[in-house]
Structure formats: structure tokens, C-alpha cells
Amino acid sequence: MYMILTGLRDMAIASGMRVLVRADFDVAIHAGEIVDVSRLEAVLPTIAFLLERKAKIRLIAHLGRPGGTRSEELSLAPIGHFLSRALGCPVRFSGDPFQEAQSDADMILFENLRFWPGEEQNDRAFAKALALHGDAYINEAFAVCHRNHASIVSLAGLLPAYAGFNLIREVEALSRVMEHPPRPVVAVFGGVKIETKLPLIRRFLGDADRVIVGGALANTLFALRGDGVGKSITDMGSTDDLSFLNDAKLSLPTDVIVASRLVAGAPSATRAIGEVQEDEYIADIGPKSQERFAEFLNGAKTVLWNGPMGCAEVPDFARGTISMAESIRKLNAFTVVGGGDTVAVLRQNNLLMGFSHVSTGGGAMLEFLSGKELPGIEALRRQ
């Protein structure tokens, strides 16, 4: 899908060279504490590589959606504290890259770029102001490569630009799923948004040997074919052509766990599809579906998974997602899992070990797999 990207190992790094690293620091922070550090850990090998070669690192990133205005709760300051501890060296924090004088510090973390409207507007003047802090640019933020933003696109055209280690890993792993993967290939989709996942379902019905759908995504497909889903979450979106619902490769749950409320401790029951009551929510896939999906996965050589099988943020309804993870982990196959909700559940249950690749991308992963050009990747290719 994509030509080989020019990466760090292709870069001539001189001692004292200032390198702007666009990182992915979009993580949940509560009361100043980082909830999940996995995205931060993903950039550490790139930072360590540069430090070993005496480069001066300038970290740029975003957090949340402040809408072009400053928000104390979306400051990157806590990220700086984590990086300093993880790397064992000082990380200077700058609250304003545009007022920052040139510095000889080994590492500087600039404030949340989305505090300025120029970032999301892909403003070239904004990018030029950032470029003054660097002699070269590295993109280590695959998760936002589908965004046409200044630090992702324009900045890559103003400096010699390279792909970070994790970004290259993402592109290689997802390309491996798309280009001549070992067969049988099984794709598993869950979650909510049908407008982003329906193109993938259709694509993999053509390319894969089996497509398994669960979660709220399956609820929507049940509703589209006329099955009752009670009060369940659906996302009807734009679905003019429903012929894919009859594809023999498409596998939906045959039984589900239902509950009166999607909260811990709520009374629940198992229902066959077609027997869900009007006052019930579909909360998870049922035990027969878990067994059936495990059988479909047996013998697979390539597996792609994005999206939980139910309301997995509630532990009572995470069993289907956990069962899916356990089935995939034991395969002798190339396995890729992605999507923030899915990865979060697997991490909480210590189930990430055994997957060939855990993607940090959400929307970027889906767009890549749909065959769309990602602006951030294209900007690197133009180099």
C-alpha cells in the first residue's frame, strides 16, 4: 500500500542537531495523573535513539480538543514529568513555543499545540514558527496521521522529514494485513460507528475468509435486517446497499447477553437473536456466540481485530471481548488489535501479550485499512 518510508536509521544525525519530534501524547489524565502510559512509552525508543546520538529533542504534541484556546486541564505538563522519570534526564517544559527563545536544552516539551487554532487549520505560518525550533522533523504520531494538521502535514514539508520507529512499525504491520497476508484471514469488528467500519466490513468481505461482527456494530446490523434490538445502541448511518448482510462470510452473534441497564450489577439474561425485549439492552455476545467465533478463528493465519464485542467498559459485560482475546492469543498467526476501547479492556485484563502488533491508531488505523491516503503518511512520502 505504501512505499518504504524514510526512517530514523536513514537520518544523518549530527551532535547538537535540533530534532522536532511530533509525538502522540493524547492520553487520559485525571487529577494530574496519567491513566495509561502506553502511548507515551511507544515514543521512548525514538527519543532514546536521538539522545544517544547527542541530538537536541523538541517534542510537540496535542492533548484532547481544546478548540484553539488554552485549557489548564489539557496541559502537557504532566507528560513532561513522566518523560523525565522514564528517561532519567531533565525535560524542560515550554508553555509557548512561539515565545520561546532558542535554547541549548537537551530536551524541551512544548505545550499542547491545539491551544492555538493554527494547528488544526494546517496554517503554514504556524508550521513555519514551529520549524524555527528544528533542523529536522520526525513523525512519531501514527494515531493522528489521518488529520490534515500543521504539525502533521505542513511541518513535514518545511524540514527534512522522517518516520519514527513506532510509525514505521504501524505501517508495516497494517500493510502486512492488507497485502498478501497468510490465509485464512479473519477480520473481527465491534464498537459503534458504522460509518467508519462499514467500508471495512465490505472490503474484508471481499478480501478475508471470514468477517466476525459484534458489539454495538452488530446491533446496528441486526436492526438493519429487521431483528429487534430493544433499547440497544445503534448507529444507522448511511447504509443504502444492504446486500452485504447476506454474504456467507459475514458472521453475527446468534445469542446475546441482555440487561435492563448497562451498569455493573444489573440483572442480565441470555437471549437468542430475535428474542430481545423492548426494554432490554444488548450488552455482550452470548456464550454460544463466543464458542462459535472461537471455532471460526481456529486455524486462522492472519487476524485483524478492532472494536469490543459488547459494553466491555462494564466488567460484567466484558466476557465476550475477553473470550475473543483469549481465542486470538492462542493462535499460531499474525494478529493485530487496535482501537482505544478494545486495547484498554485487554490491558486491564493483562491480555495484550501474545498479539503480534497492538496498534496505537484508532481512526488512522481504520482509514489506513480502508485504503484511504493518510495526509501524515503522504507528507513523509513526498520527502
Tell where the protein language model's regions lie, with residue ranges:
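Active-site loop-to-helix "anion-binding N-cap" substructures in soluble metabolic enzymes
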Residues: M1-Q383
